[in-house]
Regions:
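Conserved beta/loop motifs at nucleotide-recognition and modification sites
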Residues: 30
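Rhodanese-like catalytic fold shared by cysteine-dependent sulfurtransferases
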Residues: 1-27, 35-69, 78-116
């Protein structure tokens, strides 16, 4: 079940919760790593928006989300938390936003689908 810290403007989900939300069609996932990291391995179906582009890409993220929840993922969960904060600051706070804890490392370790 997603958790929320009242000090943060976003929630947190495990990779298992993220996969369930994606499988149920309730969420989309945005990978905020750099293109070279993304090219090595990424969760299936994610959209690449490097963390330093999140603020300028909010309209594209909103379009990609289509009203669904937005899950931010990075390598381990640090940059994706920052990306969620940036997204809120840039006006995306009206959508449910989540940081995927453990990031791509945990996604791969869990054996969840990767690639395009």
């Amino acid at each position: 079940m997603p958790t929320r810290d009242p000090r943060e403007p976003f929630g947190r989900v495990t990779v298992a919760e993220a996969k369930q939300l994606l499988d149920e069609g309730k969420a989309v996932m945005v990978d905020v790593r750099e293109p070279n990291e993304y090219a090595e391995v990424h969760a299936k179906g994610v959209r690449l928006v490097p963390v330093n582009h999140v603020i300028t890409e909010v309209p594209q993220i909103r379009d990609f989300a289509g009203g669904k929840e937005v899950l931010f993922i990075c390598r381990s969960g640090q940059r994706s938390a920052l990306a969620a904060e940036y997204a809120v600051a840039a006006g995306l706070g009206d959508l449910p936003l989540y940081n995927v804890e453990g990031g791509t490392l945990a996604w791969v370790e869990a054996g969840f689908p990767t690639g395009d």
